[in-house]
Amino acid sequence: MNCGCHTEQRDFGLHPYVANMEQIAVQNYHFRIAAWTGDYLQMTLMCIPACGEIGLEIHEDTDQLIRVEQGCAVVKMGKCKDNLDFCRSLRRGDAVFVPAGTWHNVSNTGRGALKVTYVYAPPHHPRGTVQHTKADAE
């Protein structure tokens, strides 16, 4: 039975690809899945459960764009791991730019799943990445 959900787990990278980013993000139930990975850019989709978080991280050589497609969140960033002096609330449609070399974390502050689109330049995850849970990502 087809429920109408986007269930294909495929990285469409290296081919032209058109997608409604909000729609495919909302239909994603994996912690992280690479939706498109090129040579210089990557888009992943994430699903963060209520009260969950991405986890504090830094990417020394990768800029990021993070866009909330469903839910609400808080993003914290800073140059030092122990001093995240930038804090903003995010809701559907909001985007945050994370410069390379910046510590950051996104926490789900809503009651439902947080659906997020991540764009990395250059790509950060291996082509075809599928991580069903946060534990799979660690």
Show where each model-derived region lies:
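Glycine- and acidic-residue-biased ligand/ion/polar-headgroup-sensing regions
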Residues: 61-80
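A short, N-terminal "cap"/entry segment at the start of jelly-roll beta-barrel domains
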Residues: 1-42, 55, 88, 134-138
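Short acidic-glycine-tyrosine-enriched beta hairpin
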Residues: 80-99
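Conserved short histidine dyad/triad with adjacent acidic residue
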Residues: 44-60
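Short beta-strand His + acidic residue motifs that chelate non-heme Fe in jelly-roll/DSBH
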Residues: 54-56, 75-76, 98, 104-110
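Short loop/turn positions at the edges of beta-strands in beta-sheet-rich folds
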Residues: 37, 50, 60-62, 69, ...
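Double-stranded beta-helix
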Residues: 3, 9-12, 23, 82, ...
